[in-house]
């Protein structure tokens, strides 16, 4: 059995597998946003070579990124063809996940080229200034910007930009623990 056919795709996250310039998933803790994003990017990266930039506003080390989650999901599914280092994650077909913080790299991020998908994790912390520089950087034809976040303030730049005033090319989905097929008793107790 092909491992990709065994990956469970929660109904709320099916739009991750359809082309949209912006894919924005928001909601409370336990909504499976990060896990669903990682699975979708891994599976799509196995089908065709992708350059995937994983970012957040502040990232002082790789440990503060989604690197560990992506690594764990690859190991969970026992996927072959992946090479995992402390800096990046590569597939034998050319797919590459790489990780950068925005706040301390925003000017160097402008020179990053050829990104197919940019995943902005904890997007509620990303400043409007960072969004203004990041969006035009992800300019490859057919490229996408994915954002996942737990809302904090309605004044957060991501909430204003994508939830209250979504661009026409955006799919914006609010999710909760009810959309999470992996929701465990530990989270329920909280």
Predicted regions and their residues:
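Short, flexible loop motifs at catalytic/binding sites
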Residues: 1-190
């Amino acid at each position: 059995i092909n491992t990709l056919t065994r990956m469970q795709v929660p109904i709320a996250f099916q739009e991750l597998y359809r082309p949209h310039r912006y894919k924005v998933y928001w909601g409370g803790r336990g909504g499976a946003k990060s896990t669903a994003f990682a699975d979708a990017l891994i599976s799509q990266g196995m089908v065709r070579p992708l350059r995937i930039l994983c970012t957040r506003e502040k990232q002082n080390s790789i440990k503060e990124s989604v690197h560990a989650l992506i690594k764990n999901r690859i190991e969970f599914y026992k996927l072959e063809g992946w090479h995992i280092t402390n800096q990046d994650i590569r597939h034998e077909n050319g797919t590459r996940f790489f990780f950068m913080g925005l706040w301390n790299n925003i000017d160097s991020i402008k020179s990053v080229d050829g990104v197919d998908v940019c995943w902005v994790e904890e997007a509620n912390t990303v400043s409007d200034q960072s969004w203004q520089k990041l969006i035009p950087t992800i300019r490859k034809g057919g490229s996408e910007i994915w954002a996942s976040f737990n809302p904090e303030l309605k004044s957060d730049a991501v909430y204003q930009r994508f939830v209250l005033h979504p661009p026409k090319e955006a799919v914006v989905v609010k999710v909760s623990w009810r959309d999470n097929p992996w929701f465990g008793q530990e989270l329920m107790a909280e």
